[in-house]
């Protein structure tokens, strides 16, 4: 038995554990901790900061900030996006604002120089278009998938950041209407998004989806085995 077959056999023997997110409970001075999951093929683990809930028509129901314990999320990835470092390279379903928000260019703080701003706008456009195209192709391959079609219908409205600002999830500068880079007010009044993101900025918020499809499947798209 070579080592590659041994890895395959071990994976198959533990298939019942694939995709399960379990936690080891707190005990004494030890805090609750995540047990590293056995990932499905072409999947990765990411910390999602915001959950957006839609109905099956792709209409926004609500959005919420994920507390630290509920952030770990198993997401599908492509061969390219699983190891992305720079440039536009979208995940297929759950991703950062740069990819899922069609109104990203309206709200991302602009680069100072004209040349950098031009490059920034090009990257933002390519990021969203790549995400939309991948999701569209997936939905075309699986036309009966209510969740995919709902997410696709919503992101095509290109109002995601606008909706999150209006819902009090994200915050914009009063003077520029671009995303507030840091919270400068009283720390006791710090909005949840800044507390969750820590040293990171709002542009780096990672989005996951719930769809109330009313078909008996879990609304959490990231917990649906069919996805």
Language-model segments: residues:
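Conserved phosphate-interacting/catalytic interface
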Residues: 1-227
């Amino acid at each position: 038995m070579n080592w590659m077959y041994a890895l395959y056999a071990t994976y198959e023997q533990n298939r019942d554990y694939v995709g399960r997110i379990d936690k080891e409970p707190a005990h004494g001075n030890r805090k609750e901790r995540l047990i590293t999951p056995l990932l499905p093929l072409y999947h990765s683990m990411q910390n999602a900061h915001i959950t957006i809930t839609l109905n099956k028509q792709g209409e926004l129901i609500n959005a919420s900030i994920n507390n630290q314990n509920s952030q770990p999320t198993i997401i599908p990835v492509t061969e390219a996006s699983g190891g992305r470092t720079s440039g536009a390279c979208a995940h297929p379903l759950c991703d950062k604002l740069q990819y899922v928000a069609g109104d990203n260019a309206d709200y991302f703080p602009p680069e100072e120089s004209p040349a950098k701003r031009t490059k920034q706008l090009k990257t933002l456009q390519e990021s969203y278009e790549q995400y939309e195209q991948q999701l569209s192709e997936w939905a075309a391959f699986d036309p009966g998938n209510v969740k995919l079609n709902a997410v696709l219908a919503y992101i095509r409205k290109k109002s995601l950041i606008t909706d999150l600002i209006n819902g009090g999830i994200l915050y914009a500068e009063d003077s520029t209407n671009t995303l507030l880079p840091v919270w400068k007010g009283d720390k006791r009044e710090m909005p949840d998004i800044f507390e969750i993101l820590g040293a990171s900025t709002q542009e780096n918020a990672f989005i996951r989806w719930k769809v109330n499809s009313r078909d008996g499947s879990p609304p959490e798209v990231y917990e649906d085995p069919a996805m």
